[in-house]
């Protein structure tokens, strides 16, 4: 099913004003079609903050479209964040791998490293668009995007920010 979706970085819309095809106003109009009554915070983020966060390089939002009818089926937002991990239970091999891309705190077995964060991830529930993609497929689109970024820029860690309440809701909405 992943070949049935197209993932677009919203920077493509913002940069397109130069050739007159799209632009920020067209992007805002497109985002207004997104609906998620199950999680008002992710809907509000997309409509009110995603563009500014992208302009400020705090994060980048990607829109996911169904390839057959070009309907907006979901979105995800990626950011790079520092994380601190305790390596007390890691094998020596894993510790060596993490040490290559992180800083170890003196006299502690904790490492601080940059990681890709899937900060937002949601399906569009307007007009049944949510039935055109599963949560697993949307997550896979985000992971595939991160893997491309890792190939181009490096890095080895990514994580998903999720609340338990929202996770349970997604499990019932497959």
Regions found by a protein language model. Give the residues of each.
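A short, internal acetyl-CoA/4′-phosphopantetheine-binding micro-motif in the GNAT/acyltransferase core
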Residues: 119-133
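Conserved acyl-donor/pantetheine-binding loop and adjacent beta-alpha core of acyl/acetyltransferases
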Residues: 77-120
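Short amphipathic alpha-helix that is part of the acyltransferase structural core
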Residues: 2-52
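Single conserved hydrophobic/aromatic residue that forms the stacking wall/gate
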Residues: 166-174
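Conserved GNAT acetyl-CoA-binding A-motif
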Residues: 148-161
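Conserved acetyl-CoA-binding loop-helix of GNAT-fold acetyltransferases
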Residues: 129-145
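Conserved beta-hairpin
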Residues: 59-74
């Amino acid at each position: 099913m992943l070949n049935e979706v197209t993932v677009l970085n919203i920077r493509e819309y913002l940069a397109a004003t130069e050739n007159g095809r799209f632009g920020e106003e067209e992007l805002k109009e497109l985002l207004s079609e997104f609906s998620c009554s199950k999680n008002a915070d992710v809907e509000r983020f997309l409509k009110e903050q995603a563009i500014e966060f992208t302009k400020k390089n705090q994060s980048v939002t990607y829109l996911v479209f169904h390839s057959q009818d070009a309907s907006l089926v979901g979105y995800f937002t990626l950011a790079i964040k520092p994380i601190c991990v305790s390596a007390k239970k890691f094998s020596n091999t894993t510790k060596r791998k993490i040490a290559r891309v992180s800083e170890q705190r003196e006299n502690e077995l904790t490492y601080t490293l940059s990681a890709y964060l899937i900060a937002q991830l949601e399906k569009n529930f307007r007009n049944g668009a949510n039935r055109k993609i599963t949560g697993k497929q949307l997550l896979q689109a985000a992971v595939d995007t991160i893997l491309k970024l890792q190939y181009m820029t490096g890095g080895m860690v990514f994580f998903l920010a999720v609340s338990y309440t929202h996770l349970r809701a997604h499990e019932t909405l497959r």
